[in-house]
Swiss-Prot record:
Composition skew (Basic residues), residue ranges: 1-20
Region (Disordered): 1-24
Pfam families recorded: Ribosomal_L32p
Keyword Metal-binding found: no
HAMAP family according to UniProt: Ribosomal_bL32 (MF_00340)
One GO CC term, this protein: large ribosomal subunit
SUPFAM superfamilies documented for this protein: Zn-binding ribosomal proteins
Stated family: Belongs to the bacterial ribosomal protein bL32 family.
Name of the protein this chain belongs to: Large ribosomal subunit protein bL32
Amino acid sequence: MAVPKRKMSRSNTRARRAKWKATAPHLAKTVENGRVTYSLPHQAKVVTDSAGTALFLEYKGRKVADV
């Protein structure tokens, strides 16, 4: 296992850790019944009725699970 020869300075440590930041997920825009919704691609979305009650999960136009 590699062992550092010298102590790493605080500024170098923080500069290295600054690259660890997370990226925002890319959202897919879909329009249904005149409503625009944004969701994660390749993930099932919740289908709701007019009252907003969750009915089931849908992926690529198919029902995949009950809620």
